């Protein structure tokens, strides 16, 4: 299946082209978008190094705005960051005219940096539309185009068959939980890894393993926690005829079977966070996940892969693909870098009508920019053992190891 491209099938005569097609193809509109992108380039190019506030007056105005933001929100922003609306790759200008280096990228949301011309163009093109926010009751072409693009990438090495968009990562997780509950009703328990993070709705705050995120909340979700892979513990366990890794995995399997035997038929899903971010940048070998997923398959427990934070950021677009687990996943959640979030699922997990809805699935610019992001990732030199992500990872880890060697303990 190829990505939808209405331009490729447009009739040649204007009489048989929609007004929408004619507007988007208008020379005046195309020239205006070109001019906008070029103007962004010109101003963005001037931001090439960090600098302080441009004046005491701007700094004072910035501080006052931060204070006002905190008063309105009920708490100050996590960081004293109010952007001016322009940047240049890793450089971003703040409201006071100072320029900072962005090492956070909104936790992967702004993967391509600030004022990326291709994304500015995609957002400008998205503004040529009759509505701002799309949903299942009023949908233009963009949601289906983005969904198909995501699904085509996911289907390359998995059994995933459907993609359902939503407007936040935690909503993707909520949708995934409902899909798993419905498929395995009346099972009501959930298995998750220790130190996982799921989002901040009332249900996801209960599943996420952070007590501070559920203070004062009534507890209604039954969660059993599994230990995530611990390389240091595995190394300590290495002895005799079995490696430490194998021993650790065997212990984890025993723990999982203890849960499934204690609560037979009561678990709807096991949430696999293949790389833990909030929990401390924890990783695990493929064998660890595969063995646990095999137990889940035997016990008829859904294998749910939460990639809201990791999507697009490993050596392949999907972390399940990087780890060779495409044959095991039943449900996958993505977000952040994709701009619009989504749940993907196999045909066996396609829910009954009424369970999911998309009244407010995403804005035009998020849908358009998300599509461009995935196109750039899919066609650029980003993936594989020699791709840009792998090369950057090696540079980073080499420096970390050098620092650790220089400052042991």
Task: Give the predicted meaning of each segment.
Residues 2-409:
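Conserved N-terminal phosphate-binding loop of PLP-dependent enzymes in the Aspartate aminotransferase
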